[in-house]
């Protein structure tokens, strides 16, 4: 099979986005648009991907760099043909191969659609193939013109078309496949004699047709996947479509999502079978969720590794790891570098940061546990705080297995509580507690008799 090189057009600023960032780096479903396009073309068989940069190229290069990805710079944006010309040195030596040209702001394109376009060009001995779509409102798009037999004649841009031509509803999507040799020969003949004064890549098709070469129009089954993103409104629409696709893929794989329209799951998230995701849940980044979990409602996980059988209710977690069969929430904050093992209970209004919590430990309510190592079956009473910051440095607490920490205990780090030790409620612990000992760190209660001289409360 002949090689396929993808050219991703990513040079534009995208002024309608009203942003300091390149348009193609705005995210849809957690992934920059151009990266989403690159992933799709690679899955469709592209062996080499050439990204044409322009506005803030250093940011685009930094974010999109990867294996078999190459960058060329378009100093002036003089049209789509001019953009492709910048990439010619990277595919000119393989005239028998194919070149896929795709816009970096079309993140909804499916792998199957691109594969179909490539096959149409290859199987019908085409010099090129054009992905088209039927639009109810085609304003702003180039129109695909056909003859009486349905063969493609040319593509005319909105600003160059006659009223009859602009009445056509079949539009050019900006995604093309070319036989490499045919593209190279035709690019040399493209000029900028048009209303915009630009070098249109679409002129290549007219050149090929006049030379008696085949240009194959292929209509997309779903016109929405060809949508280009040019504004924040279109960005939100693209995000919505990809989010629903992701939810449908997960449901088809055995995940229950009770309301996909109120659930946000990004592209790179993985979820195991028989997990139930309740409304208001957001799964972001590289989050991985195991089997038989219940997530939500109103739970947000970002870059979290979550094992099997976990129940998370109104949990906010970031860059942490959970084992199996943990009960977390409601109203729990799990901060980075936290590792919860198995069968752990973390209840109302608890915050855990940079801590390792072993099997069976309970932090039921109103607790701050930071920079700490907790052994198995430790119990933290209500109101316990690990006092980990001295104003300059952070220090760790170590609490060994089966220790019982009484309510409203302050553990002033660095401190070590031994196995099966107790702390009395209300204590401030500043020294290590031996195993099986009871630590009392509070003032002795003093009752002052006759404190009230006369009864000020009357019936």
PLM ranges: what are they?
Residues 2, 169-272:
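Conserved alpha/beta core of the MobA/IspD/sugar-nucleotide pyrophosphorylase nucleotidyltransferase superfamily
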Residues 266-338:
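Acidic, glycine-rich loop-and-beta core segments that form the ion-binding/anion-interacting portion
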Residues 1-19:
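N-terminal nucleotide-binding beta1-loop-alpha1 segment
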Residues 1-3, 31-104, 108-119, 123:
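Conserved N-terminal catalytic core of the sugar/cofactor nucleotidyltransferase
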Residues 58, 67, 109-195, 202:
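Conserved core of the sugar-phosphate nucleotidyltransferase
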Residues 311-459:
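Glycine-rich hexapeptide-repeat left-handed beta-helix
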Residues 20-36:
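Short catalytic helix/loop segments, enriched in acidic residues and glycine
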Residues 4-5, 48, 88, 97, ...:
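Catalytic cores of nucleotide-enabled group-transfer and carboxylate-activating enzymes in metabolic
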């Amino acid at each position: 099979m002949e090689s396929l090189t993808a050219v991703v057009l990513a040079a534009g600023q995208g002024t309608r986005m009203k942003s300091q960032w390149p348009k193609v780096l705005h995210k849809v479903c957690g992934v920059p648009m151009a990266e989403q396009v690159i992933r799709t073309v690679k899955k469709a068989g592209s062996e080499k991907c050439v990204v044409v940069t322009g506005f803030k190229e250093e940011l685009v290069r930094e974010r999109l760099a990867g294996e078999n990805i190459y960058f060329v710079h378009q100093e002036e944006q003089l049209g789509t043909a001019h953009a492709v010309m910048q990439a010619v040195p990277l595919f000119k030596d393989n005239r028998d191969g194919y070149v896929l040209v795709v816009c970096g702001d079309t993140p909804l394109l499916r792998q199957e659609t691109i594969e179909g376009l490539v096959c149409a060009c290859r199987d019908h001995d085409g010099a090129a193939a054009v992905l088209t779509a039927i639009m109810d409102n085609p304003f702003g798009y180039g129109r695909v013109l056909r003859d009486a037999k349905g063969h493609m004649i040319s593509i005319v841009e909105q600003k160059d078309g006659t009223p009859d031509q602009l009445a056509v509803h079949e539009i050019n999507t900006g995604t093309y496949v070319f036989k490499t040799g045919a593209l190279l020969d035709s690019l040399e003949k493209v000029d900028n004699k048009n209303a915009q004064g630009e070098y249109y890549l679409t002129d290549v098709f007219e050149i090929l047709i006049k030379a008696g070469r085949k240009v194959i129009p292929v209509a997309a089954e779903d016109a929405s996947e060809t949508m280009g993103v040019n504004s924040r409104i279109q960005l939100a629409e693209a995000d919505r479509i990809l989010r629903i696709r992701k939810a449908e893929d997960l449901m088809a794989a055995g995940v229950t999502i009770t309301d996909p329209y109120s659930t946000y799951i990004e592209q790179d998230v993985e979820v195991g079978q028989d997990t139930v995701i309740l409304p208001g849940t957001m799964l972001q980044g590289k989050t991985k969720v195991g089997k038989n979990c219940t997530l939500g409602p109103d739970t947000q996980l970002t870059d979290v590794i979550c094992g099997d059988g976990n129940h998370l209710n109104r949990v906010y977690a970031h860059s942490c790891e959970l084992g199996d069969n943990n009960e977390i929430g409601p109203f729990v904050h799990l901060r980075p570098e936290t590792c919860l093992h198995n069968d752990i209970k973390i209840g109302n209004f608890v915050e855990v940061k940079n801590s390792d919590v072993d099997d069976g430990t309970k932090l039921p309510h109103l607790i701050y546990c930071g920079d700490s190592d907790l052994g198995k079956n430790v119990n933290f009473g209500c109101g316990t705080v690990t006092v980990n910051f001295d104003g300059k440095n952070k220090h760790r607490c170590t609490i060994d297995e089966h220790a019982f920490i009484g309510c409203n205990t302050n553990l002033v780090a660095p401190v070590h509580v031994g196995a099966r030790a107790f702390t009395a409620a209300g204590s401030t612990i500043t020294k290590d507690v031996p195993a099986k000992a009871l630590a009392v760190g509070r003032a002795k209660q003093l009752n002052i008799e006759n404190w009230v001289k006369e009864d000020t409360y009357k019936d």
